[in-house]
Swiss-Prot record:
Keyword Repeat: no
EC number: 3.6.1.1
Gene Ontology MF terms in the entry: inorganic diphosphate phosphatase activity; magnesium ion binding
The name this protein goes by in its record: Inorganic pyrophosphatase
InterPro entries per UniProt: Pyrophosphatase, Pyrophosphatase_sf
Pfam families: Pyrophosphatase (PF00719)
Recorded family membership: Belongs to the PPase family.
Binding site for substrate: 30, 44, 56, 142
PANTHER family: INORGANIC PYROPHOSPHATASE
Signal peptide positions (record): none
Record CDD domains: pyrophosphatase (cd00412)
The gene coding this protein: ppa
Length: 178
């Protein structure tokens, strides 16, 4: 896969592309895209027997404070194969920190051209409380059994926070490339 050939999206930051790394409900394995090689690699096996509560991936051509592309959790129930590119609409952010520093997770829903199921979801707060609780529980505990690793949930943010993180991530990536 040539990640450099994949666009950020058609209407950034309201509609962005995400490269899927981990499918919803998949085995407790953390995959990451090797950005230089353009191939999916096994990052680690999760020590906790937990499954991702949404399809998980990243926005190409972005760079977060942690040195990786912006992370995205897509709220939907259909497993998307790792390596697929999906158009999404950001609706919020879960602000967290871990042993390495800040680690935000952008929440998104599939774009309307893929499904109209989420058209009324404009913000993370439009999602069912149980969905938000499951997402928070997953990220609070998915590293629990890994020595020296931890996660602290800071707060939820709305779509404007997600848009800001995406735009900052694009600028950070541009500066890195020079």
């Amino acid at each position: 896969m040539r990640i450099d050939a994949i666009s950020i999206g058609k209407n950034v930051p309201q509609d962005v592309n995400v490269i899927i790394e981990v499918p919803v409900g998949g085995e407790p394995i953390k995959y990451e895209m090797d950005k230089e090689a353009g191939t999916l690699v096994v990052d680690r096996f999760l020590y906790t027997p937990m499954r991702y509560p949404g399809n998980y991936g990243f926005i190409p051509h972005t760079l977060s404070d942690d040195g990786d592309p912006c992370d995205v959790l897509i709220i939907n129930t259909r497993a998307i194969i790792p390596g697929a590119v999906m158009s999404v609409r950001p609706v919020g952010v879960l602000f967290m920190e871990d042993e390495a520093g800040g680690d935000e997770k952008i929440l998104a829903v599939p774009s309307s051209k893929l499904t109209q199921r989420y058209d009324k979801v404009k913000s993370y707060s439009d999602l069912p409380d149980i969905t938000l609780q499951q997402i928070q529980h997953f990220f609070e505990h998915y590293k629990d059994l890994e020595k020296g690793k931890w996660v602290k949930i800071l707060r939820w943010g709305g779509p404007e926070d997600a848009h800001k993180l995406i735009l900052e991530g694009i600028e950070r990536e541009k500066k890195k490339k020079g």
